[in-house]
Structure formats: C-alpha cells, structure tokens
C-alpha cells in the first residue's frame, strides 16, 4: 500500500480535482497535479492582464513527447478551472463550501454573478472542444494552451 504523507492543503486539492476517483487521484499525484493547478490559479489571479513571458515559460515545460501525460493533465486541469469559475458564479456563496482557499478570491473576482457565469460556461465548452480537437489533429500543444489562456484573458477583460 502507498503511504502518502500529504499536507492537508494537498489532500483537499487531490480529492477535489480527482473527482473522488482513486485512479485520477494517483495520476494527479504522479504528475504533481496540485502544483500544476496552483500554477493555473496564479495565472488566473493575474487577470485581466496575463504575464505573457511567465506564461510561455510555464507552458514550454509541458511540450515535448516525453511530457505527454503532464500535458494532458494540464489541459484537463485548465478545463476544470474554467468550468469551476463558471460554477462559482452560479452557486455564489454556496460554492465556498466546495472551493479551495486559493480559488475563492480569484473566482469571485472573475465571476461575480450568474450572468457572467454564462460567459465562462460557454468559454469552458468551446475551449474544451478546441483543445481536444487541436490535439487530435496534432496542432502545436504549446500554442493551443497559450491560445486558451489568451481566450480566458479576453473573457476576463469583458468583466468590469
């Protein structure tokens, strides 16, 4: 049996992102999903103005055939993050019970109400489709992910 001495804040993030699936949680652990998700959150925290240089540096670490698993995890976590932004606007106060501390302030700023949640929900749907299609037809994964972040940035700029 694996004995995992995870800090409590990581236990929370793994159970949340793993959606209760043991297999998913193990994959998240193996590829350090908590760190990847926290990085995504730190970029979301920069909105509406992303630091393009920092973002490119981050994304470049996922590109290359030996990083395929990490890349797929990054895409999955990015899709989860966008969907959770939308969910936070719909559920408002009730979202706090199921949110990570790091998410609360960021998501409240990005999605203050159910009206804006619709925009994020549409973006989540479109981007999930674009990413999976782009990978299927072998578009450059780095460009796909950067494009997704820039579309997130565009959406954030409409909220003021």
PLM ranges: what are they?
Residues 1-77, 82-84, 88-160:
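Charged, glycine-rich active-site and insertion segments that engage polyanionic ligands
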């Amino acid at each position: 049996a694996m004995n995992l001495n995870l800090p409590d804040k990581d236990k929370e993030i793994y159970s949340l992102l793993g959606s209760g699936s043991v297999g998913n949680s193990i994959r998240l652990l193996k590829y350090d999903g908590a760190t990847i998700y926290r990085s995504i959150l730190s970029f979301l925290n920069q909105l509406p103005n992303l630091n393009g240089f920092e973002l490119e540096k981050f994304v470049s670490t996922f590109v290359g055939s030996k990083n395929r698993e990490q890349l797929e995890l990054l895409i999955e976590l990015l899709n989860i993050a966008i969907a959770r932004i939308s969910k936070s606007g719909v559920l408002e106060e009730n979202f706090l019970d199921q949110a990570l501390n790091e998410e609360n302030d960021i998501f409240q700023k990005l999605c203050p109400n159910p009206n804006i949640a619709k925009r994020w929900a549409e973006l989540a749907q479109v981007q999930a489709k674009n990413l999976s299609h782009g990978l299927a037809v072998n578009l450059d994964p780095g460009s796909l992910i950067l494009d997704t972040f820039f579309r997130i940035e565009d959406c954030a700029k409409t909220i003021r």
